[in-house]
């Protein structure tokens, strides 16, 4: 069986901080996967869908300030038929899409950076379910779809 979503960065870049791991021994779990890549590395949409956010939240929680410049895409449907999932691409140096724009899986949507709460250039890729941000309860392991 092939993957259900595309990897958001070129294949030579691997996950350097996996889903679910605690950060420095804290109880706060990592809600996505991090790919350590140089600034400017192409970020491609893992799924087809509609851009529902593209920019930098100034205030708030969730997909907020800690993610720096980021994009949220509401997927049409994953190949397994599941719906109600959206993908977040965070810490970007450049955003190439606008809210309301439709993208296809594989389209370049931005470039890797180190904006927001970041200690170095990388892409934080996150999947959330439902229509509202639910923190850990709404997060899903992105590797489930990429490695399927």
Map each language-model feature to its residues.
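Short beta-turn/strand-loop junction motif enriched in small, turn-promoting residues
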Residues: 20-22, 40, 56-59, 76-78, ...
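Short, well-structured beta-strand-loop connectors
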Residues: 42-54, 97-112
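Short glycine/threonine/proline-enriched tight-turn/helix- or strand-capping micro-motif at secondary-structure
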Residues: 14-47, 56, 129
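Short glycine/serine/proline-enriched coil/turn segments at secondary-structure junctions
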Residues: 23-26, 42-43, 61-63, 80-81, ...
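Conserved beta-strand positions that form and line the central face of beta-propeller blades
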Residues: 34, 72, 88-91, 111, ...
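Short hydrophobic beta/alpha edge segments that flank linear recognition/processing sites
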Residues: 35, 70-73, 104-118
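Zn2+-dependent peptidoglycan hydrolase active-site motif and core
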Residues: 45-96, 121-129
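Acidic, glycine-rich catalytic/binding loops that coordinate metals and/or anionic ligands
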Residues: 4-7, 80-84, 95-107, 126-148
């Amino acid at each position: 069986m092939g993957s259900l979503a595309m990897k958001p960065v070129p294949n030579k870049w691997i996950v350097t901080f996996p889903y679910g791991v605690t950060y420095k021994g804290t109880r706060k779990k990592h809600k996505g996967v991090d790919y350590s890549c140089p600034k400017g590395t192409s970020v491609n949409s893992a799924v087809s869908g509609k851009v529902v956010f593209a920019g930098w939240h100034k205030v708030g929680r969730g997909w907020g300030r800690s993610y720096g410049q980021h994009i949220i895409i509401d997927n049409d449907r994953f190949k397994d038929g599941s719906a109600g999932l959206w993908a977040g691409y965070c810490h970007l140096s450049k955003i190439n899409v606008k809210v309301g724009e439709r993208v296809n899986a594989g389209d370049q949507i931005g470039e890797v950076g180190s904006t927001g709460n970041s200690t170095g250039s990388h892409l934080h890729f996150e999947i959330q379910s439902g229509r509202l941000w639910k923190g850990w309860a709404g997060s899903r392991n992105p590797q489930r779809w990429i490695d399927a």
